[in-house]
């Protein structure tokens, strides 16, 4: 966008992302906005994680401290969420941003969108809530309170249109074309003292504390079970960047007997996945990273019983994993709740290792990855946001 068409020399945006994945996408968006219009003086502030802060977004709310899971956990942490909500409202009132970009995190952001819309602030929702999967009734909140909805999955625009929501732009998935390993399997093994000639299984329990507490124990049980059958298999436990490795180490230390063939890494998720023959991954964005890297996987998840009971009444789809939802069928095994146990997980992971099955699933994942769109989603999202703000800004 050339500067002779741009109406403002400065632009103030509030950005709100509450999950680790949203924080990463927010950082990419901020960088894309700066690159698209270097002549604009941007001011970014809002609810941030590590990556948005690294992208020089001023933090009004540190969302690393709000990274929870489930309805019950949100209820017990309600004072923290209310305080975050209050501080963002104060910041929006005092600074009067030109627009607010809400990234995913619908439990919080849809409520904030309602307040912002009422005060006349332009609301842009990037990475639209997965209402097609559960709680579809919230589409009315999108219709009422969101001025521009940027979707990242190919079928979402049509889904929203069928519900009378037409201010939707499909930009593609931010991960498409951007998920690459910095180095190959041999280098990964060298750095982590692994044998490149022996099978490697990665374990990714998620980015929230409660995910570690619920999902990591059965993962460790699965690794122990597999080790009894195949002593040659090596395990890599990948800790999310926003988590303290000590949290995982405490869980690992509690296992008896201790696992001798487990490597714990804090960074290098993509390198670990690319080097792996198979992986067990908590349902979420990491499963798409694995698909883009072609890593055969088992998708796992475990909620508290009360949350699972409530969610079961709200979910509208047969599959839970994004990989299967995008495929439109079950390609990757999903182990949810009671099925997320060490014995079952061990069996499914072992089933992924034979070369014929492994190669077949890698081919399926490559086809699914192709449905995520072309590279440059953050740049396209930035262009849509800039065009929207320009078109809705009155001439001086």
Feature-to-residue mapping (PLM):
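Nucleotide-activated sugar donor-binding and catalytic core shared by glycosyltransferases
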Residues: 3-396
């Amino acid at each position: 966008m050339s500067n002779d068409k741009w109406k403002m020399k400065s632009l103030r945006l509030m950005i709100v992302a509450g999950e680790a994945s949203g924080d990463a996408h927010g950082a990419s968006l901020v960088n894309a906005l700066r690159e698209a219009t270097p002549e604009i003086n941007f001011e970014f502030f809002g609810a941030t994680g590590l990556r948005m802060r690294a992208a020089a977004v001023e933090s009004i709310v540190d969302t690393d401290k709000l990274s929870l899971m489930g309805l019950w956990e949100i209820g017990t942490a309600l004072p923290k969420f209310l305080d975050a909500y209050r501080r963002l409202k104060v910041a929006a009132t005092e600074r009067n941003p030109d627009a607010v970009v809400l990234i995913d995190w619908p439990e919080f952001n849809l409520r904030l969108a309602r307040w912002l819309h009422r005060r006349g602030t332009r609301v842009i929702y990037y990475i639209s809530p997965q209402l097609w999967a559960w709680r579809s009734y919230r589409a009315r909140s999108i219709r009422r309170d969101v001025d521009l909805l940027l979707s990242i999955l190919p079928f979402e625009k049509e889904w929203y249109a069928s519900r009378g929501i037409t201010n939707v732009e499909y930009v593609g998935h931010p991960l498409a074309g951007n998920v690459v390993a910095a180095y190959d399997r041999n280098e990964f093994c060298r750095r982590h003292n692994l044998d490149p000639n022996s099978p490697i299984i990665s374990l990714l329990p998620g980015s929230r504390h409660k995910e570690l507490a619920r999902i990591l124990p059965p993962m460790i049980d699965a690794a122990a079970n597999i080790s009894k059958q195949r002593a040659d298999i090596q395990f890599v436990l990948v800790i999310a960047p926003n988590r303290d490795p000590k949290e995982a180490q405490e869980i690992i230390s509690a296992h008896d007997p201790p696992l001798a063939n487990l490597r714990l890494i804090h960074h290098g998720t993509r390198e670990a996945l690319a080097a792996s023959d198979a992986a067990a991954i908590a349902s979420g964005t990491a499963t798409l990273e694995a698909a883009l890297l072609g890593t055969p996987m088992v998708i796992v998840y475990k909620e508290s019983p009360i949350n699972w009971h409530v969610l079961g009444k709200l979910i509208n789809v047969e599959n839970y994993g994004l990989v299967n939802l995008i495929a439109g069928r079950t390609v990757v095994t999903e182990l949810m709740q009671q099925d997320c146990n060490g014995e079952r997980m061990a069996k499914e992971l072992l089933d992924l290792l034979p070369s014929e099955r492994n190669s077949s699933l890698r081919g399926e994942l490559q086809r699914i990855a192709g449905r995520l769109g072309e590279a440059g989603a953050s740049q396209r999202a930035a262009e849509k946001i800039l065009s929207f703000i320009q078109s809705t800004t009155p001439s001086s």
